[in-house]
Amino acid sequence: MTKEVKQLFGTDGVRGKANYEPMTVELSVLLGKAVAGVLQESKSGKHRVVVGKDTRLSGYMFENALVAGLTSMGIETLVLGPIPTPGVAFITRAYRADAGIMISASHNPYWDNGIKIFSSEGFKISDVIERRIEQMVALKEFGNFPDDCAVGKNKRVVDAMGRYIEFAKATFPRGRTLKGLKIVLDCAHGAAYKVAPSVFEELDAEVICYGCEPTGSNINDNCGALFPSVIQKAVIEHKADVGIALDGDGDRVIMVDEKGHIVDGDMILSICANDLKKKDLLRGNRVIATVMTNFGVLKYLESVGIEALISPVGDRHVLQNMLEYEVNLGGEQSGHMIFLDYNTTGDGIVSALQVLRIMIESESTLSDLTSLIVKSPQALINVAVKEKIPLDTLPLVQEALRDVRSSLGDSGRVLLRYSGTENICRVMVEGLKKHQVDSLAKTIADIVDSELGVGMVE
């Protein structure tokens, strides 16, 4: 009888509540063995794997479990400690490692954790490799186990943070500094809590830190990129030039201008795309945006001669489209920005540095840079759900969607989808008037909640 192969990977690796299926120590050991097995299938000889993590308390046990699985198969592991996800991608390349693993649940609460796997080139692994790993885990067939003298060694990389700090600074023009800029920085008590302040301070900015005291259980807790109100207030209070909010693993960024207004990923994409186009550095004068990208932002990009190619939501999908269409800039409203000229995955620190560079070079405030971008009124409501039942099988939900689309006509749109990483249904409505989109979004959200939900979430 053929054993069922259980799907472990979601849209961004394996993720779930720590110590519950699928995020258990036992599974992590098996995942370590499976990664080793895949590497040994691809080429013979010794292999090295980089392992990083964010600041969640459960990261310690998952780190040990993964290392145990990897080294039991003869893999040498290089443990980095707390470091942003883009730091793992960078160091995997810098050390010529065969793979990189990041232990993080990104923007999720502390009780969740996850495992993301990178190739030797620093890209997230393909669907094909994910399926092979799942197959090995299901069958518990990982290849040949080494004898006692051929198991792998585990080494701690003591200068991992320093290496990533220098890498991030190198994306800022040599000879320029951030002198004179006052920055409010929120690191979400996450993986960037040490490296991000160092990057901006070493470039001579005045940095006021929030969310830089991790306890293991306060990551993303009313702070960071999901809660920009923290830096909105702080920017005004400290009369700062700009606010920067990162998420728990440092791969996304939301900014705030000197007036306290939020500058999301859509606007960061627009600012950076226009700058690169002016310098003839935007490949094909195209960017990758997503189905969530604000219509007003798309109109702005078109007005400055930039074509936006639309991708499904998720930095993985954005990257796939960037590679397919040979585009060097892509991003999401949520703050995942990929600058392929610098890194192979979303990088919050590097993204913020590019915006700061543009501010300095153009002698502009952040509000100046966004002044020509007029966003369409948009409402986004997140509904926590018990399970992800296919939305097209829910008659009341489909009826509500038809009614809302009829109300909007050609002047707006509605998007209803499940999160790829959480039990959340996202309701997005866009139109001409703010009060209308708010009301229509709430109508749909209430019906989704009555059918599937456990309540609204922020």
Swiss-Prot record:
Q: Which reaction does it catalyse?
A: alpha-D-glucosamine 1-phosphate = D-glucosamine 6-phosphate
Please provide the Gene Ontology terms (biological process) for this protein. carbohydrate metabolic process; peptidoglycan biosynthetic process; UDP-N-acetylglucosamine biosynthetic process
Q: Which PROSITE patterns match?
A: PGM_PMM
For the keyword Isomerase, the answer is: yes
Q: Where does Mg(2+) bind?
A: S106, D247, D249, D251
Give residues where Phosphoserine occurs.
S106
Q: List the catalytic residues.
A: S106 (phosphoserine intermediate)
Which keywords are on file for this protein? Isomerase, Magnesium, Metal-binding, Phosphoprotein
Annotated TM spans: none
Disulphide-bridged cysteine pairs: none
Q: Which cofactor does it need?
A: Mg(2+)
Q: Which GO terms describe its molecular function?
A: magnesium ion binding; phosphoglucosamine mutase activity; phosphomannomutase activity
Tell me, in a sentence or two, what this protein's role is: Catalyzes the conversion of glucosamine-6-phosphate to glucosamine-1-phosphate.
HAMAP family, per database record: GlmM_B (MF_01554_B)
In Swiss-Prot or TrEMBL terms, this protein is called Phosphoglucosamine mutase
Originating organism: Chlamydia abortus (strain DSM 27085 / S26/3)
